Regions:
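Central cavity-lining transmembrane alpha-helices of secondary-active solute carriers
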Residues: 31-48, 99, 103, 249-261
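Conserved MFS/SLC helix-loop-helix module at the cytosolic interface between two early adjacent transmembrane helices
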Residues: 41-80
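Cytoplasmic helix-loop-helix junction between adjacent transmembrane helices
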Residues: 87-131
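Helix-loop-helix hairpin linking two adjacent transmembrane segments in secondary transporters
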Residues: 118, 122, 126-175
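Symmetry-related core transmembrane helices of the 12-TM Major Facilitator Superfamily/SLC fold
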Residues: 154-171, 363-383
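Transmembrane alpha-helices of Major Facilitator/SLC transporters
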Residues: 244-267, 277-284
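C-terminal transmembrane helical hairpin of 12-TM major facilitator-type secondary transporters
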Residues: 271-316
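A late C-terminal transmembrane helix in Major Facilitator Superfamily
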Residues: 311, 317-364, 368
Length: 392
């Protein structure tokens, strides 16, 4: 999971370097940022069912190999920029498969007999923490390497190759929790009978309470990572890449820090974490609009932190709901659906780039508050209706 987050975010911190080095336009780098999603969708929807049928470890191994190949293509893209496109696409495929199989694997490893002491919701928090750690460290490491190392658009990717190798070694020593046919491994206690959870419940609850929140999981950090730095760093000549690296660390880093808050909110009410997360996204968008309008890097950094908090709360909510809703033999598939909806948010920077041809960037960011507020109101309404409860 950490390798997945690292692979996704190492490119984000280098957007400024691609502007000043190979001379890629803002539209091109935004499109490269978003093409990741085109690979992520098949990675999720193929990786999830395969992990349910064939086991978690084979899918994770394959995804790590694809991710390493993608990083090699990105390194080659320093001199042949056309290779950046397949590199980003394959990055998405590898990350998608890692997310779907890895989230399910963590869920099962956080349950008896592998873990007999963790509280409910621990798996969701662990998945979010590992992913956020990869986001934070990957972007910062890439930025610092690119700032001071030779051949920055090559050497910045070397740490991910080392991390992928380490992840493969650790995965090889981790117990397999599922066997072929979508059944839990023999060492795992038998799952409750299917009749304990009515068949329509997981899908219906997912569509009503999880799907509307999911895109905001990555709308928030994608704006902070790919949009804000380039709009406020005009006065940071020579330090743009370092500033972008700091933003890429602060945004998911704040997501890590709000994990205890997410746990307390979830104990109060089923949707409390989602409501708080969406409220943070709204506040972050308002701060981002102010920072862009006044070209304030400090305010943009604060906005990135608040958007990161929104990301952390929303992802914790979504993973907790998915873990509670999904039967064991559908866990990876429902997890894949959640991540697929989340990563639609990565298209946001490209949409903002297109809209700024007609509107000021600050206006576009303010306009994004409207759908965020509408989503908050919708979830608050649906989540407080009588009869709305999470399966146990």
């Amino acid at each position: 999971m950490t390798a997945s987050g690292w692979s996704a975010n190492q490119f984000s911190a280098l957007l400024g370097a691609y502007h000043s080095g190979p001379g890629l336009t803002a539209a091109t780098t935004s499109a490269l940022f978003g093409v990741y999603v085109l690979g992520l969708i098949p990675g999720l929807f193929l990786g999830g069912p395969l992990a349910d049928r064939r086991g978690r470890r084979p899918v994770v191994f394959t995804a790590l190999a694809i991710s390493a190949l993608a990083t090699a293509l990105l390194m080659a893209g320093a001199t042949a920029t056309g290779l950046l496109w397949p590199g980003r696409f394959l990055t998405g495929i590898g990350a998608g498969a890692l997310l779907s199989a890895g989230s399910a694997w963590i869920k099962e490893l956080s349950s008896p007999p592998y873990d007999t002491v963790s509280a409910a919701g621990a798996a969701a928090r662990r998945s979010g923490l590992f992913l956020s750690a990869g986001f934070a460290t990957g972007g910062l490491a890439a930025a610092l390497t690119a700032q001071w190392a030779p051949a920055p658009l090559i050497t910045a990717y070397l740490p991910h190759l080392a991390l992928s190798a380490a992840a493969a070694l650790l995965a090889a020593r981790t117990p397999e929790t599922a066997t072929t046919g979508g059944q839990l491994a023999a060492t795992t206690p038998a799952a409750p009978a299917p009749a304990a959870v009515p068949a329509p419940t997981p899908g219906t609850a997912f569509r009503r309470l999880v799907a509307p929140v999911a895109p905001w999981v990555f709308v928030a950090p994608s704006i902070a990572l790919a949009t804000l730095p380039g709009l406020v760093d005009a006065g940071l000549t020579g330090w743009q890449t370092v500033y972008a690296g700091i933003v890429t660390a602060v945004t998911p880093g704040t997501g890590l820090l709000v994990a205890p808050l997410a746990r307390r909110l979830a104990a109060r009410h089923r949707i409390a974490t989602a409501v708080a997360g969406l409220a943070a996204v709204i506040l972050g968008l308002l701060l981002a609009a102010f920072a862009v309008a006044h070209i304030r890097p400090d305010a943009a950094l604060l906005a990135a932190a608040v958007l990161g908090a929104g990301y952390g709360l929303c992802v914790a909510y979504g993973l907790t709901e998915v873990a509670a809703l999904a039967p064991p033999d559908r866990l990876a598939r429902l997890t894949a659906r959640f991540w697929a909806l989340c990563y639609l948010g990565f298209c946001t920077p490209y949409a903002i780039t297109l809209l700024t041809g007609w509107f000021a960037p600050a206006t576009v960011l303010l306009a994004a508050v409207v759908p965020a507020a509408a989503t908050l109101a919708l979830i608050a309404h649906r989540g407080t209706r009588r009869g709305t409860r999470r399966p146990v």
